[in-house]
Amino acid sequence: MHTDALPLLKADEYPGGLWYYEPHTYQPYRYVLGRVGRHPLVCIGINPSTAQPGALDPTLKSVERLANANDFDSWIMFNVYPQRATDPNDMDRVPDRALCDENLRWLQAVLAQTEPTMWAAWGTLIEKRDYLPGLMREMVALTREKNIPWVTFGKRSKKGHPHHPLYLRKDSTPEPFDVENYLDSCF
């Protein structure tokens, strides 16, 4: 993957104000969706659903609520795999490497152009496809290079997976999350 030509994280006007949204039109994949700010809570889920600027799904409404309640100036939704699927069982059986590489380029852009806190929020969905933990490791490596902190909200699953945003209490607060230890112990 080339790092010398990172894309520019650009804010554009959409319903409700300024948003980060890549690609800029609805596609069968999405790399970035979020509100503009310098210190975002970057939520890492498994795959995007139908949300877009001004039309958030219930998961992203929860992400926005928790970012605001915990004093982050913004939030960005990112996913381990960028294919849109309202049902994670519909995700590709074999990952599209071009989509994965472009996803990593956009993550690098977010890391280079903001001062984020990463939120592990994929729940048990990381077990849906065998390739997801490997893709997660690639993302974690990028955050390790920049010493980016990781957090999670709520109780972890029996297997240790971080809680999905959809079912979190309104008063949830972030807790430090050792994402590398998690990956080593769970996969």
Predicted regions and their residues:
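Active-site and ligand/interface coordination hotspots across diverse enzymes
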Residues: 1-57
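Short acidic (Asp/Glu) patches
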Residues: 27, 56-64, 97-106
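A short mixed-secondary-structure module that forms the rim of ligand-binding clefts
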Residues: 49-71
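A short, flexible beta-alpha/helix-coil linker loop
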Residues: 47-50, 83, 125
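Short connector loops at secondary-structure junctions
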Residues: 73-91
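Residues at the starts of beta-strands that form the adenosine-phosphate
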Residues: 40, 73-74, 117, 149
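Glycine/proline-rich loop-helix segments at beta-alpha junctions forming the active-site rim
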Residues: 91-187
